[in-house]
Amino acid sequence: MVTLENVKDVSVKTKMSQAAYDASVGTGAQVAGITVGEELSVDTLLYLTMVHSACDACEVLAEFVGGTKENFVKMMNDWVKKVGCNDTNFTNPSGLHDDNHYTTARDMSKITLAALKNANFVKYSTTTEYEYKGYTLPHTNLMLHPGYVTYYYEYAQGIKTGSTEQAEYNVIVKASKDGYNYLAIVMKSPQQKIKNQSYLTKCSFVDAKSLFEWAFDSLKYTTIVAKDEVIGEVSVENGKDADTVALVAANDTNVIVPVGLDKSAVIIEIQEKILCV
């Protein structure tokens, strides 16, 4: 988002520096294979970052947008504070491990929901594959690809994955079905064998898929109080003709509740004192 908000023309090009190369290559992080001196557009670098999770692309963008990587990281921290994050601190642009680089699922939800308001962020983060140097780079979110039967979820869209030895496997993914939209955030999930499988499973994708299946099957947007419905009575002090008055809903009240919830289970709390006009 720092890049999208500060670069108006994503066709502008910038070069890979030696410092950006050294910060990514050889670290064990995923890279796109950008070479020192290679010139790429911001548009390409954003696709490599969001689709391929390319650490080297992140480093190039950080230097270009921030002037220095350190200043870009400051811009990142300023931006997340602006969207209400209180438990996040970044020390680098790519998410490589650092004891002082941290966040929470709650803060990541704030970051993602704010970012999803930007149409360009949606475009880059939900692209399922990107052509680069003659190769088709698939989105690192395996929930988007039918070939991965264990992980694939037809309603999934984007957004971002990340993994390090310390943080293990993480995914933020959106899913839309029948007019409902949910965001799943799974962090520090292991890679392990499940049941009798002979291979290791990235549990972040399995868990996100399970969360979506539960939400779509178990929750429903429901009108619990209809407009003009009488929901109770309140006392009236010094009433001319009555000591009470009916309390009527001015509008429908719609909330997401468990499927099959008995309306009698809904508790309506009424203020002790209500001003009648």
Question: Model-predicted segments: where are they?
Answer:
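Active-site-adjacent loops and short helices of periplasmic peptidoglycan-processing enzymes
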Residues: M1-R106, L113-A119
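Domain-terminus/edge residues, biased toward the C-terminal soluble/receptor-binding domains
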Residues: C85-N86, D99-Y102, R106-V277
